[in-house]
Amino acid sequence: MKKLAIIIPAYKPRFLRETLDSIAKQNNHDFTVYIGDDASPYQLETIVDQYKNKFDIIYHRFEQNMGKKDLPGHWERCILLSEEEFIWLFSDDDLMPFDGVARVIQALQKHSGGKYIFRFPLEVVDEYGKL
């Protein structure tokens, strides 16, 4: 079993491909990505299928949309799909640096043995790809 679950609650396809591209470039592949499709009207599975040979990825389509009225509930049901020791809650419009997984696993192992919530530095990129 992999060490890290990367949980991606998903609804819109707009940035999902870029998100998955950034995950595919990781220098540490000790992770499984879980895509929780929040009953999207878009064909998210078609995008996800393009990454099945690049890293471990599991797609699950939920029949009921929860994000509009209970976003934490949607996150929770996505988390319940995973079995890994550590969980990284990601978004379908987030980008990961090439060493993101390695840095997260290193931080989590350094502070193991308790319950922690980590927040890592981020850079905001607009819809045009500018910081």
Where are these regions (language model features)?
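Cell-envelope/extracellular polymer assembly enzymes that use nucleotide-activated donors
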Residues: 3-7, 32
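Glycine-rich, basic loop-to-helix element that forms the pyrophosphate-binding segment
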Residues: 63-82
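Conserved donor NDP-sugar-binding/catalytic core segment of glycosyltransferases
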Residues: 101-131
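Short, well-formed alpha-helical segments that are part of the catalytic scaffolds
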Residues: 12-25
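Acidic donor-binding segment of Leloir-type glycosyltransferases
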Residues: 24-64
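Acidic donor-binding/catalytic loop of UDP-sugar-dependent glycosyltransferases
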Residues: 43, 94-107
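Active-site acidic Asp-centered loop
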Residues: 38, 90-92
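Short aromatic/hydrophobic "clamp" motif used to bind/position activated sugar donors
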Residues: 87
